[in-house]
């Protein structure tokens, strides 16, 4: 039977850690706290990128914690929302790295997800205006299980690990079966330390070509 995110996520939801985490999040919601993203957006990354379609994983940390920003894809924001600084820097690198890439006026990365780029945060919820507020709730265990499934059941996936948090998260990826590209985080605090000039987007496409897989059209965001 082909693996699906539905079966993988259902198995995790039955575990004690997940049920405990759900109770904590529900308790916060019932106190009137704003939790991002909205409940029906928590698993957007999995909805847009089916398990067997995953070619690339871009690991983020926790969701954006401003009103209307987070929608379940790492680094991405919905159309009409101001482009966050880290994504702005990703676009700058793309413009240098990919011939013809035009920086879009929005930060909506859905077209990447639809091409097999799993835009995965390591923590999937956050309280409004409180970065990392759900970091210890259990999401790290959940996303460890997600990464392990990709590691164990797929071949040739390209992991883009930017910054110490993502690199630590990817420490157990089998590099004899998968590819890891590492750089500093694209945030304004660290982008100049080696994210700019890393050429990860063109390198990703080169690695896909070597496997006879279709490249990611990174510029698809401009026309979307």
Curated annotation (Swiss-Prot):
Family: Belongs to the uracil-DNA glycosylase (UDG) superfamily. UNG family.
Listed EC numbers: 3.2.2.27
Top-level taxon in the UniProt lineage: Bacteria
Main location: cytoplasm
Any one GO cellular component localisation term in the record: cytoplasm
Name of the protein in its database record: Uracil-DNA glycosylase
List of catalytic residues: 62 (proton acceptor)
Location within or outside the cell: Cytoplasm
Keyword set includes Calcium: no
Root EC class: hydrolase
Keyword field: Cytoplasm, DNA damage, DNA repair, Hydrolase
Alphabetized GO MF terms: uracil DNA N-glycosylase activity
Catalytic activity: Hydrolyzes single-stranded DNA or mismatched double-stranded DNA and polynucleotides, releasing free uracil
GO BP term, example: base-excision repair, AP site formation via deaminated base removal
Pfam families assigned: UDG
Role according to the record: Excises uracil residues from the DNA which can arise as a result of misincorporation of dUMP residues by DNA polymerase or due to deamination of cytosine.
